[in-house]
A protein has these predicted regions:
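Catalytic alpha/beta core domains of metabolic enzymes, predominantly
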Residues: 131-137, 144-254
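Residue-level detector of family-conserved "landmark" positions at structurally sensitive sites
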Residues: 48, 84, 110, 211, ...
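A general structural signal for well-ordered alpha-helical segments in protein cores
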Residues: 67, 93, 179, 218-221, ...
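C-terminal alpha-helical cap/extension of soluble enzyme domains
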Residues: 13-17, 41-42, 205, 220-310
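A structural signal for short hydrophobic/aromatic patches embedded in well-ordered alpha helices
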Residues: 66, 126, 159, 236-239, ...
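Active-site beta->alpha loop and helix N-cap motifs at the rims of alpha/beta catalytic domains
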Residues: 2-149, 158, 285
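Hydrophobic alpha-helix position signal
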Residues: 38, 100, 201, 268-269
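Alpha-helix N-cap/helix-start motif at coil-to-helix transitions, marked by capping-box chemistry
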Residues: 7-10, 215, 259
């Protein structure tokens, strides 16, 4: 399913988590292995430094080191990658983007500054100043509630008219009505929806998939995408019900705690395609524990073995 007015091809987008040792040093060989493994599993569209990749927590030396390794390994593995930047102001975001741009990146993921909710004029100025600084690059907007403002279809329609290199979005949260709204009012953009919303979103238009469960079960993610490509509403409904049940079981298993997105992604890697992946997050954020990983793996083997890698 393609759209002749789309600025960016649809596809499956997958996050790369960043492994740290006990002293919070970058484990580059393991990170490179992850990039290669995702490509081998059929996921060449990858990004780093969203919330899952700890873009909110990383300092500049780590940002530079990870970005350098990411771009180098992507080129060798044939991955189509983007680098995320999270910051509290336009100058801070542009500064980080410039580092990645100098290293060779030409596709970026950005989110609104989160210190205060932006008004319409401030949203427009942010995209003008950020995207306009790098006219040779493509931008995906990471739309999430913790920025204080979720952009709507009308917001995106306004931005499409003024920002030619805004090509995609990542809709981390939202309802089915929100999915229909952004797909209908801004079809020029490739809108990526996470696994829990994608089955419903795909019934409203040419949705892309943000595959947070890809490290757990590449096969099931490809099945989900294939059902959407066929327009198989019955299969999508069954799969959505299965995803809801899986998520309820899996995320009620670990001990409770204030876990950031990266904690979940690292746990999925650990119990999925990369059993040795470390669970640590950069300070001050709390990751899952080794006991959590053991319990979650046992839960998957007992109740959802069809979601585990072959």
């Amino acid at each position: 399913m393609t759209d002749p007015i789309a600025r960016h091809p649809r596809g499956i987008l997958v996050a790369c988590a960043v492994p740290w040792d006990d002293d919070e040093r970058f484990l580059e060989p393991l990170f490179r292995q992850q990039v290669r493994a995702l490509v081998a599993d059929g996921f060449p569209q990858q990004y780093v430094f969203g919330t899952a990749g700890e873009g909110h927590a990383v300092d500049t030396p780590r940002f530079r080191a990870v970005t350098t390794a990411f771009l180098d390994e992507a080129a060798a593995a044939g991955a189509d990658v983007m680098v995320g930047v999270i910051g509290l102001s336009t100058p801070a975001i542009v500064e980080r983007l410039a580092i990645a741009h100098d290293l060779g990146a030409r596709a970026f993921q950005i989110s609104l500054p989160a210190w205060g909710r932006l008004a319409d004029a401030e949203v427009d100025r942010f995209f003008d100043d950020v995207c306009g600084t790098f006219p040779d690059s493509r931008f995906l907007h990471y739309n999430l509630g913790r920025t204080g403002r979720m952009l709507t279809g009308a917001d995106y329609a306004r931005l499409v008219a003024r920002i030619p290199n805004l090509v995609a979005t990542k809709q981390a949260t939202g309802s089915q009505a929100h999915a229909e709204d952004v797909l209908r009012l801004s079809p020029e953009l490739a809108h990526h929806f996470d696994v829990d919303l994608f089955p419903a979103a795909a019934l409203h238009g040419p949705a892309s998939l943000l595959a947070s469960y890809a490290p757990l079960s590449p096969r099931r993610i490809h099945d989900l995408w294939d059902a959407a490509e066929r327009g198989d509403a019955a299969a999508l409904a069954r799969m959505q019900a299965g995803i809801v049940a899986l998520s309820a079981d899996l995320w009620s298993t670990p001990a409770p705690g204030p876990h950031m997105d990266g904690a979940y992604d690292k746990l999925l890697l650990r119990i999925g395609v990369m059993p040795g992946f470390p669970l640590r997050l950069l300070s001050p954020y709390q990751g899952f524990t080794e006991d959590d990983a053991v319990r979650c793996r046992a839960l998957m083997e007992a109740k959802h073995p069809d979601w585990l890698p072959a």
